[in-house]
Amino acid sequence: MTYLFTVLELLSFLVPVLLAVAFLTLVERKVLGYMQFRKGPNIVGPYGLLQPFADGLKLFIKETLKPSTASPYLFFLSPLLFMALALLLWNLMPVHTPTLNFQLSLLLVLGLSSLSVYAILGSGWAANSKYSLIGAIRAVAQTISYEISLALILLSLIIITSSFNLTYIMNAQEFSWFALSCLPLFYIWFVSTLAETNRAPFDLTEGESEIVSGYNVEYAGGPFALFFIAEYANIILMNLFSVVIFLGGPWPANELFPLNVLTIGLKTTLLVFLFLWVRAAYPRFRYDQLMFLTWKSYLPLSIGALCATITIVLTLGIYLPLF
């Protein structure tokens, strides 16, 4: 019976995530449409609200094709792994009560999010296409490069709070958000999450003018839909993660259910809208600019912030002044 409740709890958490992903695709197309002085999808259902379901149905009833020279097992295993990792990480987020609560939950999130690199590289290599492989190599290099800055920023917050537990880090912001007291770190974090999720202006893995569609160029039907769903689930997840560690989670409604869940949802929605605004407003970076930004700008700043944090904590023996 306990296992049944655990499975039901997992499903009750994941179904809203999948619905949020479905409507995020619609919101993105609507936002981009209005920013470009057009309406966006408005035919399927009232105001185009049924468009995500029409798109999903179309993708999943299409024939699943595989290139004749592709690796048969890895080609289909990669999208499944990518999707599984995207959904697994949601269970560690302290929204009301985390489904999986560990003392080292922050390290687990960092480790599991790094595993998505293997799914991307596997899909690029298994397709046996030069465009797929170039896109996969770009994605891996980009993800690994920006994860270093993200890890150093997280290390600074770990030293401030003396904890690896996401719930504790969230509750430590009861009087002030880390986004206010560590504003430069929050800026670096936000831009790095754009690169980590392969979003514009860092979407070089899917540079249409160069490599068609990147690592998923040979995918069609269901496997392509899995990549698409996982990609958008990761966008919402990274913004939820940002809310938890920088924007105080459900504060000021910490103990008031369901207000605490609604507060987290509102903050996450605002950050997701920023992602969409950046996509509409900024052109794509060149690859050398992308690497210059992380290795010569963000990495030195992250290391400097870490050294400053260690110095302040050792000198004063207290947390950073939160104001």
Swiss-Prot record:
It holds the Pfam family NADHdh. It comes from the Eukaryota. One of its GO terms (molecular function) is NADH dehydrogenase (ubiquinone) activity. Its EC number is 7.1.1.2. The keyword Cell inner membrane does not apply. PROSITE patterns: COMPLEX1_ND1_1, COMPLEX1_ND1_2. This is NADH-ubiquinone oxidoreductase chain 1. The gene is ND1.
